[in-house]
Structure formats: structure tokens, C-alpha cells
């Protein structure tokens, strides 16, 4: 898992990188957490701002 995929996609297990639907707040979350889906762990990323 070299590249991180954030935002929602067709499968919940697989998150694809979609910057168009990704919000600015969630986008930062994705950059910090490269092992989890930005949307699924949005709350956790918010805590570790």
C-alpha cells in the first residue's frame, strides 16, 4: 500500500483517490493517515488535527 486512497468509491473496502468529492478537511486527513480511508476514519483524523 504505497499510495493512499481516500474518499468514497464503489467498494467500501477499497477507497480510490477522488479529489473532486474529497473535502478540504477530509483531504488533510487522508494525507496524514495513509493506511485508512479518509471517509471511514474522518472522526479519528479530526481528533489528530
Swiss-Prot record:
Keywords: Chromosome, Developmental protein, Differentiation, DNA condensation, DNA-binding, Nucleosome core, Nucleus, Spermatogenesis
Signal as UniProt keyword: no
Cellular-component GO terms for this entry: nucleosome; nucleus
Location(s), subcellular: Nucleus; Chromosome
Tissue expression: Testis.
Molecular function as annotated in GO: DNA binding
Any GO BP annotation: chromosome condensation
Similarity-based family: Belongs to the protamine P1 family.
Purpose of the protein: Protamines substitute for histones in the chromatin of sperm during the haploid phase of spermatogenesis. They compact sperm DNA into a highly condensed, stable and inactive complex.
Identification of the protein by name: Sperm protamine P1
Amino acid at each position: 500500500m504505497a499510495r493512499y486512497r481516500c474518499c468514497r468509491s464503489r467498494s467500501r473496502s477499497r477507497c480510490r483517490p477522488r479529489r473532486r468529492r474529497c473535502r478540504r478537511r477530509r483531504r488533510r486527513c487522508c494525507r496524514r493517515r495513509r493506511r485508512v480511508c479518509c471517509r471511514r476514519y474522518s472522526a479519528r483524523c479530526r481528533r489528530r488535527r
